Amino acid sequence: EVDMRCKSSKECLVKCKQATGRPNGKCMNRKCKCYPR
């Protein structure tokens, strides 16, 4: 999980790619969830 606020899952794709190296993630409860870990 990335502690970043989001409005859409598209915002998380960039953040997840930075965090995990893969642009896989969803915006849930206004926070980004990245997977797989």
From Swiss-Prot:
Query: What are the record keywords, sorted?
Result: Disulfide bond, Ion channel impairing toxin, Neurotoxin, Potassium channel impairing toxin, Secreted, Toxin, Voltage-gated potassium channel impairing toxin
The set of disulfide-linked cysteines is 6-27, 12-32, 16-34
Q: Which residues form the signal peptide?
A: none
Q: Which family does it belong to?
A: Belongs to the short scorpion toxin superfamily. Potassium channel inhibitor family. Alpha-KTx 01 subfamily.
Subcellular localization(s) per the UniProt record: Secreted
Q: What does this protein's UniProt record list under function? A: Reversibly blocks voltage-gated potassium channels (Kv1.1/KCNA1 (Kd=79 uM), Kv1.2/KCNA2 (Kd=547 nM) and Kv1.3/KCNA3 (Kd=492 nM)).
Q: In which tissues is it expressed?
A: Expressed by the venom gland.
Q: Which GO terms describe its cellular component?
A: extracellular region
- Site positions (Basic residue of the functional dyad) are 26
Q: What is known of its domains?
A: Has the structural arrangement of an alpha-helix connected to antiparallel beta-sheets by disulfide bonds (CS-alpha/beta).
**Keyword DNA-binding in record:** no
Where is the site described as Aromatic residue of the functional dyad found in this chain? Answer: 35
| Other remarks in the entry | Negative results: does not inhibit ERG1/Kv11.1/KCNH2 potassium channels.
Q: Which GO terms describe its molecular function?
A: ion channel inhibitor activity; potassium channel regulator activity; toxin activity
In Swiss-Prot or TrEMBL terms, this protein is called Potassium channel toxin alpha-KTx 1.10
Record's InterPro entries? Scorpion_toxin-like_sf, Scorpion_toxinS_K_inh
- Record PROSITE patterns: SCORP_SHORT_TOXIN
Q: Which residues form a coiled coil?
A: none
